[in-house]
Amino acid sequence: MSRGLGDVYKRQLFEETPEIEARMMLKGVLNKGQEDVALNDIVVGRAGALRIIHFNIYVNGELLNSYQADGVIISTPTGSTGYNLSAGGPIVEPTASMIVVTPICSHALNTRSIVLSAEDEIVVEIGKGRDNRTEIAAVSFDGEQTIEIYTGDQIVIRRAEDTTKLFKLSKISFLETLRKKMKGS
């Protein structure tokens, strides 16, 4: 009788001591009082009409930049290999303590991702649209819960107090996995 991969993982999980990795999460609090957490990312993106949105990003109370873009991805290291990577953001080792800010299709030539300390507080504030129109945007937590926000609304994003604990059943390192993905296998 052959043993499947599931049997190997069951044995590692229940008979051996599996390695446990703690992964940081983000907490987002809207000025409307709504809040949620995300393991991968919090995305502020356009909603409604298919036009760029205007928004400001503050880090620890200081203006980082004003953007005209399709949105912005605020990512954890775990989420850096998902939407963040697709938008041109950096790959971050998943157990690192940092936050990545990546604009989505910015209407500027010099816009790049920024890597911040996990202790920084980020505020995304929705600005006024063209001709002083009210902007409509959407906030998404790990692509799940989506909340509409409007001109003047803010979301405060910081490291969550809780972490996600993952059982590491494979002995394959992050770098080996990354190397295989970069080769297309």
What are these regions (language model features)?
Residues Q12-E16, G45:
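Mid-sequence acidic-hydrophobic segments that form the walls
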Residues A22-N110, A118-D120, R179-G184:
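ATP/pyrophosphate-binding catalytic subdomain of soluble kinases
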Residues V44, A49, N60-L63, R112-S185:
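ATP/nucleoside-binding phosphotransfer catalytic cores, i.e., glycine-rich phosphate-binding loops
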Residues M1-Y9:
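Single conserved hydrophobic/aromatic residue that forms the stacking wall/gate
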Residues K10-L13, N40:
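Charged, amphipathic alpha-helical segments
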